[in-house]
Regions:
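N-terminal subdomain of nucleotide-sugar transferases
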Residues: 1-33
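A donor-sugar binding/catalytic signature common to diverse glycosyltransferases
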Residues: 88-99, 109-110, 252-289
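Catalytic donor nucleotide-activated moiety binding site of glycosyltransferases and closely related
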Residues: 47-60, 208-243
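Conserved nucleotide-sugar phosphate-binding/catalytic loop shared by glycosyltransferases and other
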Residues: 24-69
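A nucleotide-sugar donor-handling region in carbohydrate enzymes
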Residues: 131-200
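Leloir-type glycosyltransferase catalytic cores
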Residues: 147-178, 295-337
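Donor nucleotide-activated moiety binding/catalytic core segment of transferases
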Residues: 72-79, 226-266
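A conserved, positively charged/aromatic
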Residues: 108-110, 120-132, 253
Length: 337
């Protein structure tokens, strides 16, 4: 079987790493395309995969995003035509499902946040199968032309599948002088925005300023873009550490005492690894985060002073591990639809 996967954001190599390994182990041919955005290309390489780079992020303007969308669609179509793919898979890449449909290739897309309206209008309608967590109410997806049998759902978090074989590597901390007596906090900024932009959610910068001045804390910030990296460094906060490049974020999370993130994936990785986690997300919560909050595995943050900055005892005893082969089977069902 010939399979095409498309990665457009940093989380996608993580999600697909075990799926690609499973397919390659049974002698399937897997080819990957990727958008040059954030740490996507670095993470592909770090996880032992190779990809053809097509396109880059269009920036914050609608015009820039539109130009890059059409440019990337054209590039993907030229690349994929004639390669004889049996199925195409993606995590939220509407470029893949649109291109696959035009080329007559069955496709499946998966995602775990249902309020990205334009992305899902494009991606879901073009896909053969749509695979989402069962914590997302089915009725929320009807607006995207998605319902059973096109819609398939899986239990738990996607992170519980791709982290099923994960064990943390303590060496991730070796590059910094970490005082084990201080509370180790990992922070992830909001996606695709300037932290200092006047329309940005002020809560994350406020949290960063608060933690960055506490002598009892090590605050490791994992920026999404070089712009964010430069801005955080310019603040010169004494307790803040900013890695120079992409790091083993999962190990960092597992070894931390606390995670504060404005983005969904790192929040859910922390929940899957049994680490206390706060969200500063200012948008509409999706079904996955709503369920995690009900379970007490995710806490909304409205004031940085409310953070419980304590050393964590234990490890990852609360972890849930799920079989990635089950997620892969749902995605590959597009081939037989």
């Amino acid at each position: 079987m010939r399979v095409w996967c498309d990665f457009t954001a940093s989380a996608h190599p993580l999600v697909f790493r075990p799926l690609v390994e499973l397919m390659q182990a049974r002698s399937d041919t897997v080819e990957i395309t990727a958008r040059d955005y954030a740490q996507t290309l670095q993470l592909i390489e770090q996880h032992g995969m190779t990809a053809t780079t097509i396109g880059h992020h269009g920036g914050r303007s609608r015009a820039g995003k539109a130009r890059q969308l059409f440019s990337r669609l054209s590039g993907l179509r030229r690349w994929a035509r004639g390669r004889g793919f049996d199925v195409a898979l993606a995590h939220g890449s509407h470029e893949l499902t649109i291109t696959a449909r035009r080329l007559g290739i069955p496709s499946a897309t998966t995602f775990d946040y249902e309020w990205a309206w334009l992305q899902h209008q494009l991606g879901c309608r073009a896909a053969t199968k749509v695979v989402v967590p069962d914590s997302i109410p089915i009725e929320r997806l009807a607006r995207y032309g998605t319902a059973p049998p096109k819609l398939l759902q899986y239990p738990g978090l996607k992170e519980e599948y791709y982290l099923s074989d994960f064990e943390p590597d303590a060496a991730v901390l070796d590059g910094w002088e970490i005082d084990p007596g201080r509370t180790l906090v990992v922070l992830r900024p909001p996606p695709d925005v300037s932290l200092y932009h006047r329309h940005a959610n002020p809560l994350f910068p406020q949290t960063l300023q608060h933690l960055g001045r506490l002598e009892s804390v090590h605050a490791i910030v994992l920026p999404r873009t070089e712009e964010q990296r430069d801005y955080v460094r310019s603040l010169a906060l004494p307790s803040v550490i900013v890695p120079d490049e992409a790091v083993d974020a999962q190990s960092l999370i597992a070894l931390s005492d606390l995670v504060v993130s404005a983005g969904g994936t790192m929040n859910r990785e922390a929940a899957a690894l049994g680490v206390p986690v706060y969200t500063t997300y200012g948008g509409r919560l999706g079904g996955v985060d709503e369920e995690l909050i009900r379970q007490g595995r995710l806490r909304p943050l409205t004031d940085p002073r409310a953070l419980e900055l304590t050393k964590r005892a234990g490890g990852t005893a609360q972890r849930v591990r799920r079989d990635p082969a089950e997620l892969l089977a749902l995605l590959l069902s597009a081939r037989d639809a």
